[in-house]
């Protein structure tokens, strides 16, 4: 039934069930006259069996299935392009009404991470990030966020890839906290035992620091938090991240600390992301400034070698400089890692996502 659904001919009154978390799905099913336990049954079909055909949901009454068909549908936008890196990273592109988003799967020995997008484009215009240079189109719906995970799991199963998705990171296109309501709703589905069932410690939301939204987030959901800091002081951050002129480092870290005190998912500390830009933010003095800045913030630091794209005149810090920077932080007592570049050859690495089709390999 739904395998070849024409999304443009669906009545506006119909609801895509991928837009509903468990609570909202329960209210919807009750409005159809279904029993309470039907909620878990429907979610199991959707998220365990990836079923988009109500006729196949045989443990649900015919009456309820008929009403579901009349009032709702299940639709996950399919990937239209796939690129596979030499290191096993896979990048998928989704077309949503002629606008593109990208999703990246990164397999490792002990885990497999899916990087999802929360917006089409991004309004923050961080100078070192390709997504921001493409401009902002719109927020993704809950169903469009969930569809990335849904389709990724289906695609991995089709490929007989046995490495299940163990971690999900909101580090793709867009600023998650500028799509707060939909991102939080999607997160509840990701964490729900009848949804994707991931642990909150295995789900990470990365933000540039939208302070009012971050303050709200701590009362909405508990997941691992990453702060895209990228500078040891406001002077540098103002230059490379224009959002800092609105929410400066002090306000961002203050809000992050409040989230940490609320959270159980961040016991090991908040992740501080720091892109390494040659002669901009990578000096020994910058490392010392960063250590002072974070001295009262329970944190672990992830240094990110800058991934190039056409446009900016940045250079990535060389390996020796990155190692020196990391060692200074380690000597100051900070857990410091250097991110391994994944998928750089297919423009799937951190800061390279644009949603532009390049015809490397089409589905």
From Swiss-Prot:
Binds 1 [4Fe-4S] cluster. The cluster is coordinated with 3 cysteines and an exchangeable S-adenosyl-L-methionine. It catalyses: adenosine(2503) in 23S rRNA + 2 reduced [2Fe-2S]-[ferredoxin] + 2 S-adenosyl-L-methionine = 2-methyladenosine(2503) in 23S rRNA + 5'-deoxyadenosine + L-methionine + 2 oxidized [2Fe-2S]-[ferredoxin] + S-adenosyl-L-homocysteine; adenosine(37) in tRNA + 2 reduced [2Fe-2S]-[ferredoxin] + 2 S-adenosyl-L-methionine = 2-methyladenosine(37) in tRNA + 5'-deoxyadenosine + L-methionine + 2 oxidized [2Fe-2S]-[ferredoxin] + S-adenosyl-L-homocysteine. [4Fe-4S] cluster binds at residues 122, 126, 129. Its EC number is 2.1.1.192. Its cofactor is [4Fe-4S] cluster. Its main location: cytoplasm. Disulfide bonds join 115-350. InterPro entries: Aldolase_TIM (IPR013785), Methyltransferase_A (IPR040072), RlmN_N (IPR048641), RNA_MTrfase_RlmN (IPR027492), rRNA_lsu_MTrfase_RlmN/Cfr (IPR004383), rSAM (IPR007197). It is found in: Cytoplasm. Specifically methylates position 2 of adenine 2503 in 23S rRNA and position 2 of adenine 37 in tRNAs. m2A2503 modification seems to play a crucial role in the proofreading step occurring at the peptidyl transferase center and thus would serve to optimize ribosomal fidelity. NCBIfam families: rRNA_mod_RlmN (TIGR00048). This is Dual-specificity RNA methyltransferase RlmN.
């Amino acid at each position: 039934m739904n395998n070849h659904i024409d999304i443009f001919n669906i009545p506006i009154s119909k609801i895509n069930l991928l837009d509903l978390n468990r609570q909202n799905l329960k209210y919807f099913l009750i409005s159809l006259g279904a029993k309470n336990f039907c909620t878990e049954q429907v979610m199991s079909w959707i998220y365990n069996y990836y079923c988009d055909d109500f006729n196949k949901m045989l443990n649900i009454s015919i009456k309820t299935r008929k009403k579901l068909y009349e009032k709702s549908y299940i639709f996950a936008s399919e990937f239209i392009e796939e690129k596979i890196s030499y290191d096993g990273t896979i990048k998928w592109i989704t077309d949503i009404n002629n606008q593109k988003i990208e999703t990246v799967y990164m397999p490792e020995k002990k885990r497999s991470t899916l990087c999802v997008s929360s917006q089409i484009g991004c309004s923050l215009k961080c100078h070192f990030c390709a997504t921001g240079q493409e401009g902002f189109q719109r927020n993704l719906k809950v169903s469009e966020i969930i569809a990335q995970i849904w389709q990724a799991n289906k695609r991995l199963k089709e490929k007989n890839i046995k490495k299940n998705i163990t971690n999900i990171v909101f580090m793709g296109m867009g600023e998650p906290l500028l799509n707060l309501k939909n991102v939080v709703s999607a997160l509840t589905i990701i964490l729900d035992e009848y949804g994707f069932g991931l642990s909150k410690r295995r789900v990470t939301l990365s933000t540039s620091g939208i302070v009012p939204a971050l303050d709200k987030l701590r009362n909405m959901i508990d997941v691992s938090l990453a702060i895209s800091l990228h500078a040891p002081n406001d002077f540098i951050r103002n230059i490379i991240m224009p959002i800092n002129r609105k929410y400066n480092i002090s306000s961002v870290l203050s809000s992050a600390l409040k989230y940490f005190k609320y959270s159980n998912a961040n016991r090991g500390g908040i992740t501080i992301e720091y892109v390494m830009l040659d002669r901009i933010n990578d000096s020994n003095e910058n490392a010392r400034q960063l250590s002072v800045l974070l001295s009262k913030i329970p944190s672990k630091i992830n240094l990110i070698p800058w991934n190039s794209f056409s446009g900016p005149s940045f250079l990535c810090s060389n390996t020796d400089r990155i190692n020196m920077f990391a060692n200074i932080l380690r000597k100051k007592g900070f857990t410091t890692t250097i991110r391994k570049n994944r998928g750089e050859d297919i423009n799937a690495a951190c800061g390279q996502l644009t949603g532009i089709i390049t015809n490397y390999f089409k589905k």
